[in-house]
Amino acid sequence: GRKVYPDFASLPEKIDLAVVIIPAEAIPGVLAEGAEAGLRNALIYASRFGEGGDDVGAERAAELRDICDRTGLRISGPNCMGAISLPERLLFYPTSRVRGLPLGSVGVVFQSGGTFQFWLEQGAARGLGYSYAVSSGNELDLDMADYINFLVDDDHTRVIACMAEGVSRPDALMAAVERAFEADKPVLMLKVGHSAAGQAAAQSHTGALATDHHVFTAMCRKFGVVPVDTLDALIEMSLAFSAGRLPHGDRVALVGYSGGAKGLFLDIAETDGVSMPDFTPETQAVLREHIDAGVPTSNPLDTGAGLARRFPEFAEVAKIVAQDPNIDMVSVQGQLPLAEGTAGDPDLFRQIRDSTDKPVVAHNRMSQNINDAGRAFQAAAGIPFLQRLPEVATTLKALAAYAERRRRGIPPFAADKVSLDPDAAVEDVLAGHGISGPKSAFASNAAGVGDKALGVGFPVAVKIVSPQAVHKTEVRGVALNLASPEDAVAAAQAMSDRLLAAEPGAVVEGFLIQQMVDGLEVIVGVRDDPQFGAVLALGIGGVMVEAMRDVAFRLLPVTDEDVGDMINELRAKAVLGAFRGAAPRDVDALVAAVVGLSNSWPALQDRISDIEINPMMVGAEGEGVVAADIRSLSRDQN
């Protein structure tokens, strides 16, 4: 038996860690006593510390925070499932199911306890090995940022896999993932809460503030964090990133012996935006010598059924493909054996890998059961065997995106070369960064609109200016293509009458008269997010953007390349080209304007919390862009 002590004071020496397995209501008193006796670390399994709006639990959590602040005690949890240290073979976990996990290079941080255990088991079954793994729970004290920082400094860890439900300290998290990026330790992040219901569930589970999914993804892109959508994908990506190779580009080759798989992957590649270029003529000529007559030498490559049973020849074909200068990553068809010695030679896969410095993975068309024989085969082959073609596409895209972010680095704000009065109008700040509006004038009443319109030049647009007409289209406060002074006056008077009829107390400050500008309507804006800072949004469609939700997001600052990526993410990006007889749009001018808005933010951020240009009119190539409507929200208004 083991000797039991009644309290901390009775212990013969100070302890490093207290694993707390007592009711929640007793924990603050016990840990206060322990801290006074020299306890410095505690792990708390219990819940009821404020999750889901529990007031009594919140008071209990506040008591624990006070103990931490007064004594320096560090707490993991509460509401967690413990931690595992594979290098030291230490297990602080309430069940024995995770015993025997293999040592490896993946560090794991999950806020969810039950999912944590399940994912560790499934990852190990797929051949993942772990350094450290922690279920962070409510993160009352230590949080995901702390654990990521620890893993960045740990020599055993090469990849960090995370599942986040909420964010306790956004600034600390950004600093931690930036350190990981600088150390070339990829952080793979599965974030719960894409939907409003998912955000509410995450908040009630951990008590942490659930952030907007688009903003969180923008944070990931800025700091090289790899966003992940499913638990399965987190395993596939952990395997691929653990292999340690990054591509020089995003071009993928698929080598297999199934025509059906070839067609399926082409569908997936088109949907997911996977680049699959043709092989060079030289490569195709060499391939023709190795594959069956009549089999196309195109990418994806179906070598024909004959090579399915002649794997040394199949491996030679894969090596040829891997040498093609048009290709950055190679996936070869392969299924793990269910029994030792039943199929294949793992050394042939290793030879394919060793023939190139490009990432090489194997792919299975569907998920399969993987046992000890399969794991041993994968280890001997030296490459990850990815399951299911959609995960293959997602994983290879993620490798390319991470490599591209490493090439670009994390952009700083450009030094502002524009000298402006700190109290300059928002429009003047934007103009200093190359963003200007159409010729315009202001009339304080409807009667004066006609003369002002003459000065601007017809046709004109007239817009009501009123605190009660922020979204002008919703109150019919915009009139377009007015061709005479009389039309302009009548339109102004009509929109004023409509607003006052709908809201008798409304204040009509006047009317903005603008020269009509042709072009494609785009929305671009910046919002100061309370968690992650300034967020840029770019979308196509003007007033339709809210209905279509076709918007890309980034954290500031952005570069020309970042804006190009944002444009490519838009579903309606085709309208910027030669679309249905229209001339191609001035994309270069649009990119320059969006970067200009990004660069203007440091001069504006102390005064305003939001700025929106909607619409920004994008002219034909060479015609530039015009900010047709600029709206900002001062920090006093927010």
Predicted region positions:
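Catalytic-core regions of core metabolic enzymes
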Residues: 1-638
